[in-house]
Design a protein with these regions (language model features):
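SAM-dependent methyltransferase catalytic region
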Residues: 4-213
Length: 213
């Protein structure tokens, strides 16, 4: 059966709004290509960066970040292997990252949920410009995590996939015309752009000779 996410990109969007598709350079990345890229990144982390667990690494580093509303800085702890897909689309690359990491937990299902909350969600980041793709990325990731047996606690973090333009630099919140929810999305994305020491940028950014991105 054809993946409905693929159907959205390849059929629906091309018929519903071909101009938007062309203007934004939106094209679906074939699954074999996605799998190859994710496995390659995992292998490079192991062989070139001396991280035996690759994408599943849980080590942390410290970095000085700005305090909100002040000019001062404080030291904050981050996971070393921070992952970012700057053009998330429907979440194809991020879901493949989850699948790659999940393979390393074969026979350790009992610790998977804790790992997801403590060491996966805090470092899996995505930016997406189009609302429909953003919504489907959240749906796709949530469905996959449920399929893996992930059982969230009452303190579950949200998925760190945000509706934002990756090419916009961090800028302080101005509190102008945005609705509250959209303002929060922008604020959260800005913090990632400003503070998070991203180690792995992975994905397939949209391309068009005349792209409006």
């Amino acid at each position: 059966m054809e993946d409905p996410i693929i159907h959205f990109y390849e059929t629906f969007l091309s018929e519903y709004d071909p101009k938007l598709r062309k203007a934004r350079g939106v094209w679906y990345t074939p699954q074999p290509v996605v799998t190859f890229i994710v496995r390659a990144v995992d292998d490079i982390l192991k062989t070139e960066f001396n991280l035996p667990r690759g994408l599943a690494d849980t080590s942390k580093i410290k970095k000085k970040v700005e305090l909100q509303g002040t000019k001062g800085k404080h030291e904050k702890e981050f996971h070393r292997v921070q992952i970012l897909d700057p053009a998330t689309g429907t979440g194809t690359f991020l879901t493949e990252v989850v699948k790659q990491i999940y393979k390393t937990f074969e026979g350790q299902q009992g610790i998977w949920s804790n790992y997801v909350e403590m060491h996966l969600l805090p470092r899996l980041n995505g930016f997406e410009l189009l609302m429909a793709s953003y919504a489907m990325a959240h749906l796709k990731l949530n469905l996959l995590l449920t399929e893996t047996g992930f059982k969230p606690t009452s303190n579950q973090q949200r998925l760190r996939v945000f509706l934002t333009n990756s090419l916009e630099e961090y800028h302080p919140h101005t509190g102008t015309l945005f609705a509250s929810w959209l303002s929060n999305e922008a604020d959260e994305a800005n913090l990632i752009k400003r503070d998070v020491p991203v180690m792995c940028v992975i994905g397939n950014p949209p391309y068009s000779v005349s792209s409006a991105n």
